[in-house]
A protein has these predicted regions:
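Sec/Tat signal peptide C-region and signal peptidase I cleavage site
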Residues: 18-22
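Bacterial N-terminal signal peptides
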Residues: 8-17
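Bacterial N-terminal signal peptides that target proteins for export
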Residues: 1-8
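Amphipathic, charged alpha-helical segments and their helix-to-coil junctions
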Residues: 23-169
Length: 169
């Protein structure tokens, strides 16, 4: 019994020496902040222009394929079997090239979007990190991934740090 009491007292003394501090938690909606940045509008416009250029290029290529197919259909009656076979093969190759170009255009568009938005997201992340270090936050969570957002919403502080006007809620 005496050993149990001594053990409990020793444990109490040990834990009394620890300085228990509350962790400062915050959350931020970086997507909303990002969309409010002037850089975001410029990136969206650049991306839209890039998409339009790719679309025009694909439409022109598709138009050439349609014209080739129509020409083939109109003139296939007067063609030899060998010429018809060559034209059909050519048409299939053109269609496959079009599909390949469309796939490459989609990938290129996604890469461009990622490249443009990554630079903006980096600015937001750096502002969040700066704020966390200066104001002593232990953790800052992205609000879009949480079911419950406890702690302080630092989104307006990040907006101010990035020079974005903050409206009163």
């Amino acid at each position: 019994m005496k050993n149990s009491i001594k053990s409990i007292l020793i444990i109490c003394v040990l834990f009394a020496g620890f300085n228990v501090t509350a962790q400062k938690l915050g959350h931020v909606n970086s997507q909303a902040i990002m969309q409010e940045m002037p850089d975001y509008d410029a990136a969206r416009k650049e991306l839209e222009s890039y998409k339009n250029d790719l679309t025009k290029e694909l439409e022109m290529y598709q138009k050439l394929i349609v014209e080739f197919a129509q020409d083939y259909e109109q003139n296939k009656g007067g063609m030899s079997a060998e010429t018809r076979q060559r034209k059909e093969t050519d048409l299939m190759e053109r269609q496959q090239n079009y599909e390949k170009k469309a796939y490459e255009a989609e990938n290129s568009l996604q890469q461009k979007e990622q490249q443009l938005l990554q630079q903006i997201m980096l600015k937001v992340n750096n502002a969040v990190k700066d704020l966390a270090e200066k104001e002593g936050y232990s953790y800052i969570y992205e609000v879009t991934t949480l079911l419950y957002a406890g702690g302080e919403d630092i989104s307006d502080k990040v907006r101010k740090k990035l020079g974005i006007a903050v409206t009163a809620n």
